[in-house]
């Protein structure tokens, strides 16, 4: 079972130590989609998974740019840097946009 943290308006998983691996879930996903990945990689990586506010953001803000902005705010709030970012489905698209707009924050 994943330990979900709540801090400064964000819900997220933050487990393990080592280089940071940030995972973004898809449109119909949630934090639990990544549980097996957390179990496998948290011994080697700091695995961070924010809960994307797909259904709680105002509809006009819930597009790709709004979600990218949310991820930027999340990264700044918890102080992430030099991370590997990846996602599945919609989360993969948001991860790509984040990396393109913030190349100094990602290692791959």
Where are these regions (language model features)?
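N-terminal cap/lid segment of alpha/beta-hydrolase-fold proteins
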Residues: 1-9
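Conserved HGGG/HGGXW glycine-rich cap/lid loop of the alpha/beta-hydrolase fold
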Residues: 8-57
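Short Gly/charged-rich anion-binding patches and loops
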Residues: 36, 70, 94
């Amino acid at each position: 079972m994943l330990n979900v943290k709540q801090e400064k308006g964000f819900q997220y998983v933050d487990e393990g130590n080592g280089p940071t691996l940030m995972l973004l879930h898809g449109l119909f996903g949630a934090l639990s989609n990544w549980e097996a990945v957390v179990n496998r990689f948290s011994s080697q990586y700091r695995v961070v998974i924010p809960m994307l506010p797909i259904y709680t953001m105002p509809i006009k803000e819930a597009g790709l740019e709004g979600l990218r902005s949310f991820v930027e705010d999340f990264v700044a709030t918890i102080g992430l840097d030099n991370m590997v970012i990846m996602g599945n489905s919609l989360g993969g698209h948001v991860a790509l946009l984040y990396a393109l707009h913030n190349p100094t924050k990602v290692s791959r």
